[in-house]
Amino acid sequence: MVGTRVAPIFPVTDLAAALAYYRGLGFGAREWHGGGYGFLTFEGVEIHLGAEPDLGKRPDRRATAYLFVEDADALARAWLAAGAEVRSPEDTEWGQHEGVLIDPDGNMIRFGSPMP
C-alpha cells in the first residue's frame, strides 16, 4: 500500500545548530530521543534532519524540498528578516512565483505561490 506522506531528509553537519536555525525561521523543531536525527514541521509540512558530521567533505550530499505556499513574497520577507539566505521570488514560465532558501549546510527549500 502506498503511504500518504513524504518527508525529505536534509543532511546536516551539526544537528543542534540546524534545529536552532530552523526554529529561528518559525519551524517546529525537535531532536529524536536517540540523537543524530531531528524533525521539522512548518504549516503541515515535515522535513527530517540527519546528522552527517563529515558532510563538508561530500558536496554531493545535499537535499531539496518544495513548499507550496499562499504568499511566497511574505515568506521570503519573514525568512530574510530572520537572517536567512533567501533568493527572492520571481515569476516562472510554469505559473509559479518562486524563491529559494539555502540553509547553512547547503540544503535548499524552494517555495512558491501561484502567480496572480
Locate the predicted segments by residue.
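Residue-level detector of high-confidence beta-strand sites
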Residues: 30-32, 89, 111
